[in-house]
Swiss-Prot record:
Subunit and partners: Binds trophinin, tastin and cytokeratins.
Claim: Cytoplasm is one of the keywords in the record: yes
Family of the protein in this entry: Belongs to the bystin family.
Protein task: Required for processing of 20S pre-rRNA precursor and biogenesis of 40S ribosomal subunits.
Annotated localization: Cytoplasm; Nucleus, Nucleolus
Identification of the protein by name: Bystin
Ranges for region Disordered: 1-105
GO cellular component: apical part of cell; cell projection; cytoplasm; cytoplasmic microtubule; nucleolus; perinuclear region of cytoplasm; preribosome, small subunit precursor
Any GO MF annotation of the entry: snoRNA binding
One Gene Ontology term from the biological process aspect of the record: in utero embryonic development
Biased composition (Acidic residues): 96-105
Bias-annotated ranges (Basic and acidic residues): 70-86
Length: 436
């Protein structure tokens, strides 16, 4: 058999295998070529969008996002140059970030979008403010904070122990372990300077402790930064039961919000976001923030506008809203009550008849009122007539028309009267359906 001639181009190619090996290889699946083709296809897909094209796509998307943010943030105002966001504290990257850190960039983006709404001072009509002050409580009760509650509990406990135990067999009141105090004093130092980043693990476990109020008192909530208050609200709203969350809202969050509004004439963005996060438990939010704010009798128009904006922006279950409207309608009137009732009525819930009856009686109680009612009161009555005129009974409709004669408003009363007269009462509608 002659010698096989090898060409230059085929010097690296493999020779034909023996016939027996070719037959055996023919029975097997040839996966090598397919794998090579698949790998080649992946390379083609990866090379389809090059780095230069990717940069162009990201640049175009960024420009479109900036245009949208400028339109939504400034409205008709001329567009201002986009400022670079800066953190209030040292932005040192840390390992082991958890869910709190993942949400923080989203919070910063939201701050950019709403900087016009929250950084500007809330404009209040002086006439409305004077009208609301006429209905404020002249002798308001003393506001209680968490520190006051804890000190009262400690005093009561000490008195009880001293009364029950004799001097010989008496034991001192159990105090916190010194090591626990040392840990949470360190947590207090962190929260007093907190801007962003990871919270101490010792702080995150406070909701699981039986004496969480006493531990929280050690950290001095009144000295926390606004960012720390936001993170604390997230933790307590998620992990506490509704009754405990209500106490946190009422004793810690609400006093801080009111103090901030009174001092700066607007609400810090982080505290505003804390109020929104607190709505995770709507029952606790109404019982711990809105109802105490109305019951205090000292809620200013600025406070009502800021807190009311959260009601208009957030979705609230109808049962909690109905219970809150019933409670506000039955309590002593204050100017802020009209704002909150109007915002809740604007949500157009299918309210129970008991709530509607309470709202009607709430307005009818002003038939003998000698003081001039604020415009907010007439606006709330107009909203009730617009949204629920078909759900009122004939007697209620006639009583409200009589109320308009006793408490008139030159612009709003004709509109309210037109709404009431154009609707068919619910009892008349029921009679027609029965006859058919």
């Amino acid at each position: 058999m002659p010698k096989l001639k090898v060409t230059r181009g085929a010097r690296n190619q493999e020779r034909h295998a023996p016939l027996a090996e070719q037959i055996l290889a023919g029975d097997a699946v040839r996966a090598g070529t397919r794998e090579k083709r698949r790998r080649h296809g992946v390379e083609e897909e990866e090379e389809y969008v090059g780095p230069r094209l990717s940069r162009r796509i990201l640049q175009q998307a960024r420009q479109q996002q900036e245009e949208l943010e400028t339109e939504h943030a400034t409205g008709d105002r001329p567009a201002k140059p986009r400022e670079r966001a800066t953190r209030l504290g040292p932005g040192v990257p840390q390992d082991g970030s958890d869910e709190e850190d993942e949400e923080w960039p989203t919070l910063e983006k939201a701050a950019k979008m709403t900087v016009v709404n929250h950084q500007a001072e809330v404009v209040v009509d002086p006439e409305d403010e004077r009208a609301i002050e006429m209905f404020m409580n002249k002798n308001p009760p003393v506001r209680r904070t968490l520190a006051d509650i804890i000190m009262e509990k400690l005093t009561e406990k000490q008195t009880e122990v001293e009364t029950v135990m004799s001097e010989v067999s008496g034991f001192p009141m159990p105090q916190l372990d010194p090591r626990v105090l040392e840990v949470y004093r360190g947590v207090r130092e962190v929260l007093c300077k907190y801007r962003s980043g990871i919270l101490p693990k010792a702080f995150k476990i406070i909701p699981a402790l039986s004496n969480w109020e006493q531990i929280l008192y050690v950290t001095e909530p009144e000295a926390w930064t606004a960012a720390a208050m936001y993170q604390a609200t997230r933790i307590f709203a998620s992990n506490l039961k509704e009754r405990m969350a209500q106490r946190f809202y009422n004793l810690v969050l609400l006093p801080r919000v009111r103090d901030d509004i009174a001092e700066y004439k607007r609400l810090n963005f982080h505290l505003y976001m804390a109020l929104k996060k607190a709505l995770f438990k709507p029952g606790a939010w109404f019982k711990g923030i809105l109802i105490p704010l109305c019951e205090s009798g000292t809620c200013t128009l600025r406070e009502a506008i800021i807190v009311g904006s959260i009601i208009s922006k957030c979705s609230i279950p109808v049962l909690h809203s109905s219970a809150a409207m019933l409670k506000i309608a039955e309590m002593e009137y204050s100017g802020a009550s009209s704002i909150f009732l109007r915002l809740l009525l604007d949500k157009k819930y299918a309210l129970p008849y008991r709530v509607l009856d309470a709202l009607v009686f709430h307005f009818l109680a002003f038939r003998t009122e000698k003081r001039q009612l604020p415009v907010l009161w007439h606006q709330c009555l107009l909203t009730l007539a617009q949204r629920y005129k078909a759900d009122l009974a004939t007697e209620q409709k006639e009583a409200l028309l009589e109320l308009l004669r006793l408490q008139p408003h030159p612009q709003l009363s004709p509109e309210i009267r037109r709404e009431l007269q154009s609707a068919v009462p619910r009892d008349v509608e029921d009679v027609v359906v029965t006859m058919e």
